[in-house]
């Protein structure tokens, strides 16, 4: 077995969920699931597929593709537009029922390719654009590869394109399967299936991922292929594993797997459709987040899938900023709910600071208070704050303050209070700086 390039991966959960399904009349009002993330210049693009709740309005009972953007790899993410980025084809065409599993590749400046799966048994299609936000034009000779399952990712290495998918679907458990590879010299093809498929198969009953894998993205960095994937049990409890390869064909699972254990993420049943970016020394991992539901919730649990992020540090020391709360305004005397703040995971953190920033009205008399509430399990939080501080204050100014907080528990949340009795506070931001030294 090839020795892993990263001996250890240190997991820190992101501010999850980072994107939830849209409203009841939105095109993604019933469900959202993760596609790949592209960084282009200073902007991050999180592609995903969604399913409408109001199918009559949208005229389709299937997935369509959208995108959210951010200036930071952990968000906050903003949906682009109020329509899908790419919709299904006309009735009777090969992708008229659904399009999903977006994988976007930047070929060069002003030239982008979007690969996707369409209908069942899921052929692969291609669309082109001069901007990552589109408009996208479908390739006139689609599909470029027939019957290749759920698309995971496409990378270009040495002039050759490597396409990875979950195929065949349902081989190991419902909706899960092994990973397969196809290659081509051009995005349009012809695509040739690798004769050694599958390139990543289930190793045997009793392993943590013996139910197979959901589609997963692929990275290429400094001579190595990297994939983070959702591995499942038959009970659909999915954690995240990591595998690597020097040739894109023979993959080795990391001995530390699973590198993201769903058991350490409170209330979560699994992570699927996993993709990643690498900004050394940090991997930013993106996935569909599924929730544990009770028996009386199961009938309404369709769509209880949101988008999530995780950080995996490849070395120590490390430090990074994580957006925690972003509010356009906080009304006079208002106090945020604890549920409005995502959990801040501190299990692998020994350096923790919070930075508050906001803008005050010219006639404001008081400022912003920040309270930190601890939890040992991420489900129940103390009723008394473990830390409290007031942001810097000056009427009519944008003020900020950074305070170190003792990371003595596994999780923390923040509650914000406007101390002013008559004036709202604008442009409120709270950022956690997390690290290990």
Q: What do the PLM-derived regions correspond to, one by one?
A:
Residues 351-354, 405-427:
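Noncatalytic modules at the cell exterior or secretory-pathway interfaces
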Residues 1-322, 336, 348, 394-407, ...:
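Carbohydrate-active catalytic/glycan-binding domains of CAZyme proteins
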Residues 321-332, 418-437:
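C-terminal interaction-tip segments
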Residues 365-378:
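Short, surface-exposed beta-strand/strand-loop-strand elements in extracellular ectodomains
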Residues 54, 234-235, 358-367, 420-424:
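Extended, low-complexity, turn-rich repeat/linker tracts enriched in Gly/Pro/Ser/Thr and Asp/Glu
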Residues 327-346, 360-365, 396-398:
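Surface-exposed ligand/attachment interfaces on beta-rich extracellular proteins
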Residues 383-393:
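Solvent-exposed serine/threonine-rich low-complexity stretches and specific carbohydrate-binding patches
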Residues 342-365, 429-435:
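Aromatic, loop-rich ligand-recognition surfaces of beta-strand-rich domains
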């Amino acid at each position: 077995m090839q020795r892993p390039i990263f001996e250890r991966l240190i997991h820190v959960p992101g501010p999850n969920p980072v994107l939830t399904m849209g409203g009841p009349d939105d095109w993604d009002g019933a469900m959202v699931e993760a596609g790949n993330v592209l960084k282009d210049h200073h902007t991050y693009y999180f592609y995903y597929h969604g399913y409408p709740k109001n199918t009559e309005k949208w005229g389709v009972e299937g997935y369509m593709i959208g995108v959210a953007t951010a200036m930071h790899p952990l968000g906050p993410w903003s949906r682009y537009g109020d329509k899908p980025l790419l919709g299904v084809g006309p009735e009777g065409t090969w992708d008229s029922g659904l399009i999903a599993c977006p994988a976007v590749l930047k070929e060069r400046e002003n030239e982008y390719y979007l690969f996707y799966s369409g209908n069942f048994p899921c052929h692969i299609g291609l669309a082109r654009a001069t901007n990552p936000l589109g408009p996208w034009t479908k390739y006139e000779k689609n599909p470029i590869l027939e019957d290749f399952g759920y698309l995971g990712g496409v990378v270009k290495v040495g002039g050759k394109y490597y396409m990875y998918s979950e195929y065949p679907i349902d081989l190991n458990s419902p909706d899960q399967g092994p990973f397969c590879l196809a290659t081509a010299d051009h995005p349009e093809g012809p695509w040739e299936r690798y004769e050694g498929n599958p390139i990543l198969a289930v190793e045997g009953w009793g392993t943590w991922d013996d139910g197979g894998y959901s589609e997963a993205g692929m990275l290429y960095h400094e001579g190595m292929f990297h994939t983070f994937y959702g591995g499942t049990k038959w009970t659909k409890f999915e954690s995240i594993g990591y595998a690597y390869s020097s040739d894109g064909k023979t993959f080795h699972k990391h001995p530390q797997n699973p590198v993201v254990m769903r058991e350490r993420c409170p209330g979560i049943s699994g992570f699927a459709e996993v993709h990643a970016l690498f900004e050394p020394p940090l991997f930013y991992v993106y996935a569909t987040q599924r929730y544990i539901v009770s028996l009386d919730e199961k009938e309404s649990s369709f769509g209880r899938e949101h988008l999530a992020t995780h950080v995996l540090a490849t070395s120590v020391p490390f430090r990074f900023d994580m957006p925690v709360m972003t509010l356009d305004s906080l009304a006079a005397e208002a106090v945020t709910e604890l549920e409005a703040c995502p959990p801040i995971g501190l299990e692998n953190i020994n350096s923790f600071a919070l930075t508050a920033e906001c803008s005050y009205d010219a006639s404001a008399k008081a400022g912003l208070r920040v309270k930190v509430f601890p939890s040992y399990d991420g489900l129940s939080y103390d009723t008394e704050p473990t830390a409290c501080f007031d942001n810097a204050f000056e009427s009519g100014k944008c003020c900020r303050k950074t305070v170190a907080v003792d990371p003595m528990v596994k999780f923390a949340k923040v509650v914000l209070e406007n101390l002013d009795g008559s004036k709202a506070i604008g442009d409120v931001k709270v950022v956690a700086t997390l690290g290990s030294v």
